């Protein structure tokens, strides 16, 4: 899109080259942009340390950095911090082929057991928003009323377990689930995997596992290097996983439900859901 007069998402500035932005004469707004410069110079870097060094040595005035990213660079000079919204979503995914987590009622119960506000505030340092629905709470189509019906509630969690006939049947401290295909009950146990490249995601996944185990689950968290993590997702070698995705700006979820989707793991492909995404 560099060669286009108005590349998508260029806003008040347009790319003239890899290292230079200039005022966009075709900008759709009549108001003056937030910054009043005729041009903005860009600095190309390859490493996180180069981002840090260029900023600390005042070679650049502004950097975009994600405190929750594995590539986050910490800065030691004085600076002003602005919060920029993004469509990055962290979430818990399930293996629909798991003998335990194939149970819809059990998965629904977990929705009420995760304190998203705590994770966003205390683990992500406030650089995240708690969202029950798979979109930003600031999005115009985010249904707050609907989201509130699925928010953190241990009372609703227990009610959902009862509806799914999940209980500690042998009184050993671990919840049990009757599996009709097996003809007997099995413990609500399994393995959650998370990529070890991000300390923040490992910490968040640990919080989820600990919270569920305190409620009667028997989950094990397994951290994996990126290549091993991807392999486990692609082969379905997991019960749950803690993931992250940068969604499109309209929060399109089709990559999860298309059989060829980039995020379709654990038998999640669903033509009905895919059609809903495409409407």
Model feature map: region roles:
Residues 80-95, 265-275:
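Periplasmic-binding protein-like
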Residues 1-35, 39, 49, 154-159:
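Gly/Pro-rich hinge or "lid" segments in bacterial periplasmic/extracellular proteins
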Residues 26-73, 218-220:
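Ligand-site clamp/hinge motif
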Residues 49-60, 75-76, 104-105, 206-215, ...:
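Short helices/loops that flank or line small-molecule/ion binding pockets
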Residues 11-14, 19-20, 37-44, 186-196, ...:
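Short, well-ordered beta-strand elements
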Residues 108, 120-121, 214, 220-229, ...:
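Extracytoplasmic/peripheral linker and loop segments enriched in polar/acidic and small residues
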Residues 71-83, 236-237, 250-264:
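Ligand-binding "clamshell"
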Residues 20-23, 102-210:
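Append "and occasionally in soluble cytosolic enzymes with long acidic Gly/Pro-rich linkers
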């Amino acid at each position: 899109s560099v060669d286009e007069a108005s590349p998508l998402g260029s806003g008040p500035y347009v790319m003239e080259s890899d290292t230079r932005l200039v005022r966009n004469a075709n900008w759709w707004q009549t108001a003056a942009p937030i910054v009043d410069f005729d041009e903005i110079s860009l600095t190309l870097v390859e490493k996180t340390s180069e981002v840090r060094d260029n900023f600390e040595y005042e070679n650049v005035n502004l950097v975009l950095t994600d405190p929750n990213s594995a590539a986050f660079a910490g800065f030691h000079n004085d600076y002003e911090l602005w919060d920029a919204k993004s469509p990055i979503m962290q979430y818990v995914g399930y293996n629909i082929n798991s003998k335990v987590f194939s149970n819809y009622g059990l998965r629904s119960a977990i929705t009420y057991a995760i304190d998203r506000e705590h994770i966003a505030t205390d683990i992500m340092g406030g650089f995240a928003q708690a969202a029950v629905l798979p979109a930003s709470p600031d999005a115009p189509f985010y249904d707050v009323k609907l989201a509130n019906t699925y928010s953190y509630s241990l009372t609703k969690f227990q009610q959902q377990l009862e509806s799914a006939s999940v209980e500690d049947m042998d009184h050993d401290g671990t919840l049990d689930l009757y599996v009709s295909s097996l003809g007997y009950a099995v413990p609500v146990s399994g393995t959650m995997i998370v990529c070890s490249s991000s300390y923040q995601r490992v910490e968040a996944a640990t919080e989820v596992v600990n919270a569920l185990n305190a409620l009667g689950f028997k989950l094990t968290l397994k951290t994996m290097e990126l290549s091993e993590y991807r392999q486990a997702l692609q082969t379905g070698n997991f019960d749950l996983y803690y993931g992250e995705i940068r969604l499109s700006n309209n929060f399109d979820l089709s990559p999860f439900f298309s059989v060829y989707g980039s995020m379709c793991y654990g038998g999640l492909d669903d033509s009905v859901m895919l059609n809903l995404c495409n409407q």
